[in-house]
Amino acid sequence: MKRLPLLVVFSTLLNCSYTQNCTKTPCLPNAKCEIRNGIEACYCNMGFSGNGVTICEDDNECGNLTQSCGENANCTNTEGSYYCMCVPGFRSSSNQDRFITNDGTVCIENVNANCHLDNVCIAANINKTLTKIRSIKEPVALLQEVYRNSVTDLSPTDIITYIEILAESSSLLGYKNNTISAKDTLSNSTLTEFVKTVNNFVQRDTFVVWDKLSVNHRRTHLTKLMHTVEQATLRISQSFQKTTEFDTNSTDIALKVFFFDSYNMKHIHPHMNMDGDYINIFPKRKAAYDSNGNVAVAFVYYKSIGPLLSSSDNFLLKPQNYDNSEEEERVISSVISVSMSSNPPTLYELEKITFTLSHRKVTDRYRSLCAFWNYSPDTMNGSWSSEGCELTYSNETHTSCRCNHLTHFAILMSSGPSIGIKDYNILTRITQLGIIISLICLAICIFTFWFFSEIQSTRTTIHKNLCCSLFLAELVFLVGINTNTNKLFCSIIAGLLHYFFLAAFAWMCIEGIHLYLIVVGVIYNKGFLHKNFYIFGYLSPAVVVGFSAALGYRYYGTTKVCWLSTENNFIWSFIGPACLIILVNLLAFGVIIYKVFRHTAGLKPEVSCFENIRSCARGALALLFLLGTTWIFGVLHVVHASVVTAYLFTVSNAFQGMFIFLFLCVLSRKIQEEYYRLFKNVPCCFGCLR
């Protein structure tokens, strides 16, 4: 028994459980029986608190300030323990996803993280930055703080964060409780700091950072920045107390503001001239002026951001490397904005805005387009529009425009259609109407050439196949040309259009060759010729489409329409064969008209020359539509686009099926007789066919 105290002391030193198992008072599952300080009892495990017998509660380490995870980390409590994880945009210094504070791990910024795609990360960064600058009350000091933090080493997260900070702080960038002279001085200082700060986000050095954003994110945040700049500069300008004309600039942005009262309205002409770019506003003329009103006008000049707002992702390309591969609209000028505020609002109503902007790239081939950035202040989604703007003058280096509204203006270089919105809508309606009428007429032609046995011949066989090919081409065009939401389906539609239109051209070529053989009097084997006609009419287009698809299948279907892309001149896989057939048919057309005119004049010498010419002209007009030579207007439109060529091409080819029906069926004596036999027993039709 004398050894028992020594054994207890030895067991305590080793922190071992004594042989007794606390049988009288059993321990809870999260506790164990131990001897501490010579006392045997139930003790809660680490991470739990209680007496070990009746209660052992989980400790909330995340609520314990001594156990907090530190800055830029979130704490998660678990049963008996906890762990820390860095917030999005940061990583642990130990490169482990989970850690605890006592192992020395901290969260550091992850510069390679795609935080700009994570709203949680953006919100966390904004809140963190706002916490740092919330105590800054003076606008100039606030802008200086943003400038210092954004002057170098920007990430996409930083750009988005500071744009949001500027947007949220723009309402603070004004002065209300200062003296008149102090207000004007402070407004000047604020505008200067504001321009210097915004320059950090729009200078060319930041383009590589903007490139890391998706197209939608880039446009949205850039729109928000421009909107914030417009609103903030106008708000600061309204703080002036006396007539003011103030300008300031940085490397890639310039600002000019005007503030004046109604007494000076006749003498102040708001304008801006920067690097040869000029903008001027013209108010509506009034007989009398309100003596109590004032006007603030703000011009903002963005030197370099145009490529960021182009429709292409390849905005990092230098202007001379632009490849107008599809129907794109690239900004080839600076972007200049004008905003205005008058009190009362009717004091200074706008009549028009004129501006002249220089081209960053010489545009000798593609047309210039006056445009403005049309966006929603609610969603900050925007796109270029030309509504309300018209081009007044343009050459290779400059373009002048006139608009009837305020916003951000620029000059676009467009490889798309050289027609206005109004003409485009009219041409669209003409195309739809013409194709519907042509489909009906072509269906009647197919029925006529297929089922009237009395008129069957080589010529009607060619007519029938031409009508079938053209019918299918126009049907696919009408149904599928604009179904570009699914890339695969759009590519299939483009491939079908490519084949059927080439097949139609092939049969137009066969029409020309067959007419030439008849007129010249060549004797041929009908069976052999029929076989080769079918091979040429249907197999040769398949070969062209097959080779084209094998070499450039990704060029079938564009982002706008389901047709061939102009990228890498892929469109010439259609234009090339079409032009060759048009050339062959034009030569055949010339020979046919010449032979027919001489033959008619020789048979009927008593008929006047005028009558012969008129007779040949009718036949020539029919041949123009039958041989597809009206497609020459399409070639002219590609070479030298204009509204005239657009209308000529649209009308002549959308209604091609109708003209074929008129010339081949309605005006044909033999087919008229067949129609008469078919409908003579129908009471409603007998009178009109008699």
UniProtKB/Swiss-Prot annotation:
It is found in: Cell membrane. The chain crosses the membrane at residues 433-453, 461-481, 500-520, 533-553, 574-594, 619-639, 647-667. It is a multi-pass membrane protein. One of its GO terms (molecular function) is G protein-coupled receptor activity. GO terms for cellular component: cytoplasmic vesicle; membrane; plasma membrane. Belongs to the G-protein coupled receptor 2 family. Adhesion G-protein coupled receptor (ADGR) subfamily. PROSITE patterns: ASX_HYDROXYL, EF_HAND_1, EGF_2, EGF_3, EGF_CA, G_PROTEIN_RECEP_F2_2, G_PROTEIN_RECEP_F2_4, GAIN_B. This is Adhesion G protein-coupled receptor L4. Residues 20-57, 58-108 form the EGF-like domain. Glycosylated. Proteolytically cleaved into 2 subunits, an extracellular alpha subunit and a seven-transmembrane subunit. Disulfide bonds join 22-33, 27-42, 44-56, 62-75, 69-84, 86-107, 370-401, 389-403. Heterodimer of 2 chains generated by proteolytic processing; the large extracellular N-terminal fragment and the membrane-bound C-terminal fragment predominantly remain associated and non-covalently linked. Keywords: Calcium, Cell membrane, Disulfide bond, EGF-like domain, G-protein coupled receptor, Glycoprotein, Membrane, Receptor, Repeat, Signal, Transducer, Transmembrane, Transmembrane helix. Residues 454-460, 521-532, 595-618, 668-690 are cytoplasmic. Glycans are attached at residues 21, 64, 74, 127, 177, 188, 249, 381, 395. Residues 20-432, 482-499, 554-573, 640-646 are extracellular. One of its GO terms (biological process) is cell surface receptor signaling pathway. The record marks 406-407 as: Cleavage. The gene is ADGRL4. Residues 1-19 form the signal peptide. Detected in the majority of epithelial cells in tumor and normal tissues. Expressed also in human umbilical vein endothelial cells. SMART domains: EGF, EGF_CA, GPS. Residues 370-419 are annotated as: GPS. Residues 244-419 form the GAIN-B domain. The keyword Transmembrane applies. CDD domains: 7tmB2_ETL, EGF_CA.
